[in-house]
Every structure is written in C-alpha cells, then in structure tokens.
Amino acid sequence: MHKASSSKKSFDDTIELKKNEQLLKLINSSEFTLHNCVELLCKHSENIGIHYYLCQKLATFPHSELQFYIPQLVQVLVTMETESMALEDLLLRLRAENPHFALLTFWQLQALLTDLSTDPASYGFQVARRVLNNLQTNLFNTSSGSDKNVKIHENVAPALVLSSMIMSAIAFPQLSEVTKPLVESQGRRQKAFVFKLARSAMKDFTKNMTLKNTLLNKKTSRSKRVSSNRSSTPTSPIDLIDPIKTKEDASFRKSRHSEVKLDFDIVDDIGNQVFEERISSSIKLPKRKPKYLDNSYVHRTYDGKNINRDGSISNTAKALDGNKGDYISPKGRNDENNEIGNNEDETGGETEEDADALNSDHFTSSMPDLHNIQPRTSSASSASLEGTPKLNRTNSQPLSRQAFKNSKKANSSLSQEIDLSQLSTTSKIKMLKANYFRCETQFAIALETISQRLARVPTEARLSALRAELFLLNRDLPAEVDIPTLLPPNKKGKLHKLVTITANEAQVLNSAEKVPYLLLIEYLRDEFDFDPTSETNERLLKKISGNQGGLIFDLNYMNRKENNENRNESTLTSNNTRSSVYDSNSFNNGASRNEGLSSTSRSDSASTAHVRTEVNKEEDLGDMSMVKVRNRTDDEAYRNALVIQSAANVPILPDDSQDRSPELNFGSNLDEVLIENGINSKNIHSQTDALADQMRVSAVMLAQLDKSPQQLSESTKQIRAQIISSMKEVQDKFGYHDLEALHGMAGERKLENDLMTGGIDTSYLGEDWATKKERIRKTSEYGHFENWDLCSVIAKTGDDLRQEAFAYQMIQAMANIWVKEKVDVWVKRMKILITSANTGLVETITNAMSVHSIKKALTKKMIEDAELDDKGGIASLNDHFLRAFGNPNGFKYRRAQDNFASSLAAYSVICYLLQVKDRHNGNIMIDNEGHVSHIDFGFMLSNSPGSVGFEAAPFKLTYEYIELLGGVEGEAFKKFVELTKSSFKALRKYADQIVSMCEIMQKDNMQPCFDAGEQTSVQLRQRFQLDLSEKEVDDFVENFLIGKSLGSIYTRIYDQFQLITQGIYS
C-alpha cells in the first residue's frame, strides 16, 4: 500500500515536472506575447515561483506595450489572491522607469479604490491601498530615502529559502544571484502577528491601546493600578510595566496575570490592525480642494500650534515648530504625518507623535478623502499667529490673500537653507519628477473643478464661465504637464509640455447636468525632461527648492501675483490687483483700479457699500456657493445674505430700456480701457485677466440668485437676464465667435463630437482641422516654435469612463489583429485617459462630424436652396457624399466610397462581437475621407438602453448605407461583404485572446457591461461560432449577420424613437 502511494506521488511529480518544463519552454519561446504572459499570471497565481518568473518576463516587454495592458495588470493585482509579491514589485519598479506608466497606474488604482471601498476588508482593497500608498510615497515625496532598504518581515518560507541559499552557495555560488530577488520580494510581504489573544478580546485591545497612549503622554507609572482598578473593563491583555518596549511588544505580549487561549484564526484581523496603525495613516494623495465644508474640522489655535479636540497638539504644528531647518514637501497637511510614520518605522520606538497618531487613527478611515486634504499653507498660516488664544476655523474657508502671503513666507523660511549644490544628481532628478507628478495631478483636479462649477451655473452662462475659468487656469501655464496616452508618443527621455489652453475656442458640449467641455490645448513636442544639468531644469530646481511652486492650477485664488512672478519668461505677467464686479469704477473711463472703494462710490445704499467692502476683503470669490455646503459656517451664511441683499438693490430696468445698471456694466467699456492704457500685449493680457475674474464673480451671483428668497422672485428674473447679457458681452471680448453664426451649425442639439474640430471642409459644416490649426498657430504667442502643436480633448466629470476605455482597448486589439492578418479594413483607434473613478479626458476625432449633424445641416441648406421639400424631407448620406466628394465616377468619390465600405465592415464586426447598442446617428461619425466610426460605448456586452433588447439586429446596416455603396449589386457593397467575412474569420483565430481580455476584466468588476458576470465572456466566445467550418462561417456572415441587419425593422424603429424623443435625424 505504501509502495503504491509512493509510486503515485512520484508519477504525479513527474507529470508536474513535465508541465513546468513545457511552460518554461513556452515562456522563453519567440512566439510568447505579452497577452500570453498576463493570461498565465491569472492561471498560476498560486505558484510563487512561476508567478515571479512571469513578472520578470513582463519586464522585458517594451513600455508602450505594457501601458496598453495596465488595466489588466491592475485588475489581476487586486482580484487574484496570491502570496506572491512579484507583480506588486513589478508595478513599483516600472513607475520608476517610466513616468507615464506611473501616472496611469496611479489613476487606475485610485479609480478602483472607489469600487473596492464598499468592502474595506476585502483582499482587493487591502492590496490596492498598499500599492497606492507606496506609489504616492515614491511619486510625490522628494526625500532621499532609498527604496532598497526595505524591512524584511518575519516570513518563514523566504527565511528558509534564504538559509538554504546561503548553504548551497558554497557549492553553487550563482544560485544566490538568481534566488536573492525572490527572497527579498517575498520577505517584504506584511505578515500578521500570531501572538494575539482570542477574537473576543479585540474591543478590549483597542481600549487598552488608547489607555496606553494616555499613560505614556502623562509619563506616569500608574499603569498597573489603573488597569486593575477598572472593574468595568476585562483583564487587560497588555503589560505596561516597561514603557520602553516597542508597540508590538506592548500590544502582543501575553498577560502575566491571566492565562489566555490563543486563537490562530484571527491572524489576518491582527495584521489588518497593525497595518492601519502603522501604514494606513501615511497614505498621501495629491492636494484636492474640499468638496464640502464640515464643522468637524474646527480646532483651536494656541501659540502657533493647532490643538485638536482631545487637547493634543497636532502633528502639523509640531512639524512646523520642530523641523524648521528641514525641507518639507508642499503637498498637503498629511505630509508631516507621513514623515512621522516613516521615522517610526526606522527606529521602532515610540514618541509622543506616535501616541497622537495612534489615538487619532482610531477614529479616521484608512483611506483619506481626496477632497478633504488641506493645503499645507493652512497650517503654516496658523502657526504664524501670535497673541491670545482664539478659535480659528482653519478648514472651513479657503485662504485669504494675506493668509496666502503669510503662508508662502512661512514655507520659504522652512526651505531656504537648501543648498542645491549639496544635493546628489539622483535627489535632483527625484525633485523634478515629483514636481511633474504634482503638476499633472493638480491639472487633472483643476479640470474636474471647472466642470463642477459649470454645473452650478445656468445653462446660458456656462460658455462664458468656462472661458473665464480657462483663462484663469492659463496663468499657471506653461507648466511641466503633458497628457499621457492622448498626445503623440514621446522621444525617449523627453515629454511634451502644455503651454496654453485656447480659451476662446473652448466649447460646452451640451446642457446636461454633467457638463463636459471641449478644450484646444497648445503644447510643445518633446520640450522637457528630467536632466538636472540643463539650464531650464536648474531654474526649476531653484523654484522647487524655494517652495515657490506650492500652489499650481489652484482656481480658488483670484490674486496670483506671487505665482505669476515665477512663471517662465515666455508667459505674460498677470495683473497685480483685482477689483470686484460690484466696484462700478473699475471699467468706467479707464479709472484707476487702485481707487477700490472711494468716497464717490455710486452705491445707492449703505448696504451695497458694505457688500463691496466684504467682497474686497474676501479674495476667494470663486468658491462662494460654487459647491454644495454641508454644515455651513456663520460667515458663509452671512456672505450669502449680503449677496442677496445686494442683488435686491439692483434697480429693475423697464422692458424698453437698453441700459444696464453700473454694477452690471463691466464689459461695455473694455475697448476704452485698453486704448487708454496703451495697446500692447501685456496690458491686453492684464485687462482680460481681470475680466475673467469678474466673469467668475458674475457666475457666482447667478448661482446665488437661483437660491434667492421667494419675495425677490420678481426682481431676480430681470437681474439674472442682465448678468447673463453682460457675461455674453465679455465672452465676445475674449475673441469668441459663435459657430452658429459663422458656420450655420445644425440645430440646437450640440452632440459632443459635433464641436470637436469644426468638421469637414464644406460650406455647410465649417472649417477643417488643418485650417483651424493654422489659424490658431498664427495668433498664438507660441506658434513660432518649430515643435508647436495643437490637440483637442473633451474633459468629462461625473461619468465613469472605464467601460468606454475598455471598449477602445478591445477595438485596438482587434485592429492589431487585422493589421497582422493583413485584412484591408479601417478602424479609428480612440484613446481615453482615466484620471479618477468619475473623471477623464477623451480624445476627439478630427475632421469628423456625426451623421445627425451632417443630415441636419445639409437638410437646412438644401431647403434654403430649394433643392428639398421643406415638409418632411431629409437629406441623405448620398447627398452629402455628392457635395463633399463630387462626381460619383470621379476618383475622389470612389475613394471615399471605398473608405466607407472598409470602415463599415470593421465596425459591423465590432458591433456584433461586443454587442454595441445605442447606435443612433448621433453616435456614428463620418470624417472628411468618407470613413465611418462609432463613438459612445456606454451600452455593450451585457447591458442595453433601458435594459431592453430593443436593437435586435447584429449591427446597423440601413438602406441608406446600401444606396451609398451602389446597391446590393454594386462593387462597393460586394467589397463590404468580402471584408466583413475576412475580418470576422481573422478575429476567430485569436478568439482566445479577445475572450481572455474580457475574462480578466469581468472578475469582481462593477462596470455595467459586466452585469452578466462570468456569462459575459461565455456569451462573447459563443458569438465567434468556433464550431463552424470556413464555408459555414461565410454563410453565417452573409446570411445571418448581413442578411438580418440589412434594413432591419428594429433599427428603423430605434432611429424613429431617437428622432421623436431626442431630435436625432434618422
């Protein structure tokens, strides 16, 4: 019996060995792809050795290919439970090699944490939090700590392997070189402490930790007496006799007075407890302005120190008092806590800061809210206060101008002793990279903030408010910012640099609650790098070391003279002072802006003058009621009342009056002001900058008027109309020209891609992309640079773009297969940059417009030219092709027809395999070469509009398309059929790759397209019809896919439904 068992075991080992040999041979073969590697990571997650080897293989692929699979790598990291640390180490290693990889991974993890936060105890949340913590520490921290000196924890398996390696190295020295990285990687894995009491003692453990902190802070020796006298508390499992022991000793020593049974089932719980005590509080996220103002953040200021509610001195104040000679990174209030946390890890001992941290962390979440992280300057300004103790609401209001100046002085004094000549090259490079990551994340946050502000502005004033906000944002450009993924590939070691946003070309895309907007961004290709020896970077390092760039893209500060002084020489200096929109002298006859509130004010009442005084004192007008407020402070409520009171005093004009009250007439005399001050670029920029500030204030007034009391309802409408009229007048002063007036844009419904570039070069659709680009270059102050370029992107907030990004990834994978198999089809490779769970940037399609807009514009023109009946007639795509490409027998038309056929075949197969729904003409684009492309993949795979399978056809193939292709007997249609067959058969060869991409992403994924769970990939595989022969596949495509789609009644009904409900032309 024993021999049979031993023989069976030997046989199994032999089979396992052969499998491993075959796997090794596959991995090392030339045909092994990156996708194969990601797929094997999922299958062999339980084997640490194989998992480690696969991760080492991953590192050999180019960074461009690795960036493509970042969503899958992150998904594997958080969903595949494994003891291996190899993938986590690989991601941290790649972030040091490629800044784009670091940013994309950071944003992807940040978005995933939003989903995982519903279950903080899950494996995925713990891993994502740990990796995000490490990423933030390395990306935003400028300290010279070494990543190599990482503590190896008490892990038995790596320790045994290490011991064996040392012994075997005597006979085989090369073994240590191979095994050492694996041992170090696994040794860093956080392990739980096994010497812990039973599960029922967890609550007592927390109470005892709090008691221990209190006793240590008071430095008393009453620990035994207090512990024994607390009859309401069970016997303490913590021995506090020797206070110099470490936290781990004090927390996990067995009590000498009672015998406690050990329960090893709670190992993971204790590991989580230790993790939260020592690590979670040090998570550092980029500074983000608070969404809500909460009274829970009120603390006392006394002698320059922030006093928490429990009476302990905050760590921020201690850092300011005790580390004045050290450099402190200007990233946020949590930085000081992180430094304390790092010191604790290095020394292993306890300090008063440790006690405070433990006491406070018990009441805080493990993952801080991005919107509640305060700028470090808030603490600095508090620390600079002197005099008697007083309460200071340090987090309820943004900084005033004086507080901002004081904070910059404090920050400057903290870092002025840094000598750049004493820093190593590595430290300088790290400072440059940290500055780049800070600028990137702050820029993304600023775009999100603008969208949130626009959502609170009336629809009519959104475009004016958008241009004002973008003009203010431009004050911090040029900056070390590029747009990963969306901009063209960089040269090795170089990055693109954003220089300005063309504010007068920006567009609000629709009037929905979520306000996406179009940006045209000017940038210089391959403009900057991280070489600390270059002249430009030397100046930048001086700026960073002097802490001059602490605030960037911060829309809360309206007076930015200090920041403008530090801008690059190529940017224009902004105006020093700002006046309020309530100051009627600001733009009258070019009067001096320094007069402010003079004795000759045109106010009709003392209350109005009082409002002006308050407004001039409060510089941060941009935030006034632009966000929803929880637990409003008294000051905010008071200011709101003053605004309403001021609005009530604005005289109501008769209907036949053309004049505005002086308070609202801030834009009429702009030309006079510019002429009086002298027509030069600096003055024009300065005056327009001031105008942007005042437009923001007008937007604030509109938001306030919408909340006005009932007794003011009659006057509010008139005042509101006056403000909007003034804003539109200023909007014209920015150089904006309405596309409706210029190009006869089709209809009121501006779909997102209709304003991307201006559209195809025809008389009824507008200028093409090349013309627009050249026009902007001629008027740009950076257009003379040889590496100048222009890009258009859509900024979205409030929508989860990860599903659409996954769709574009799948389409690009299919396009790569078609290129490899030499199938002559065309696909637009769209890109999306995810910056959080509900924000992102979307690439636009240049020289393309939706079929809806083309039809509507052409219909209007044909009716005007009497070529179409105005009673129900609608222009067709063939009419558009005839006007755009000429004679049907000409080369230009035939080429456009061929382009239409090749692109239609590709998207037909894509729509069938991915089950793309909502295929109305607003989501189908035609470019200036005749190519068709689909956008908006909000409904695909498992979900459909209204959860109803309304679109039953495999893809959209209308009679209009057939007419454009020359009919069912036309050569173009026959080519379409053949290309559809070829493209479908080519994808069938790589069905496993496409299905596995779906399988990896569907696990524990909350995106709507994965509502069917595991059945999502099963159904996708079924659509490939892998059981059919080649001949049967041809029949399936021609008779089922094309035959069922051609002129489908379901397609016609859905188009008619969209026409009736949304006004989208069918």
From Swiss-Prot:
Residues 770-1049 form the PI3K/PI4K catalytic domain. Residues 1-133 form the PIK helical domain. One of its GO terms (biological process) is endocytosis. Residues 934-958 are annotated as: Activation loop. The modification Phosphoserine is found at S10, S236, S384, S396, S592. Pfam families: PI3_PI4_kinase, PI4KB-PIK1_PIK, Pik1. Residues 776-782 are annotated as: G-loop. One of its GO terms (molecular function) is 1-phosphatidylinositol 4-kinase activity. Residues 915-923 are annotated as: Catalytic loop. Residues 374-411, 570-597 have a biased composition (Polar residues). It is found in: Nucleus; Golgi apparatus, trans-Golgi network. Residues 598-609 have a biased composition (Low complexity). CDD domains: PI4Kc_III_beta. Its EC number is 2.7.1.67. InterPro entries: ARM-type_fold (IPR016024), Kinase-like_dom_sf (IPR011009), Phosphatidylino_kinase_fungi (IPR021601), PI3/4_kinase_cat_dom (IPR000403), PI3/4_kinase_cat_sf (IPR036940), PI3/4_kinase_CS (IPR018936), PI3K_accessory_dom (IPR001263), PI3K_accessory_sf (IPR042236). It catalyses: a 1,2-diacyl-sn-glycero-3-phospho-(1D-myo-inositol) + ATP = a 1,2-diacyl-sn-glycero-3-phospho-(1D-myo-inositol 4-phosphate) + ADP + H(+). One of its GO terms (cellular component) is cytoplasm. Belongs to the PI3/PI4-kinase family. Type III PI4K subfamily. Interacts with FRQ1. Present with 1600 molecules/cell in log phase SD medium. This is Phosphatidylinositol 4-kinase PIK1. It comes from Saccharomyces cerevisiae (strain ATCC 204508 / S288c). The gene is PIK1.
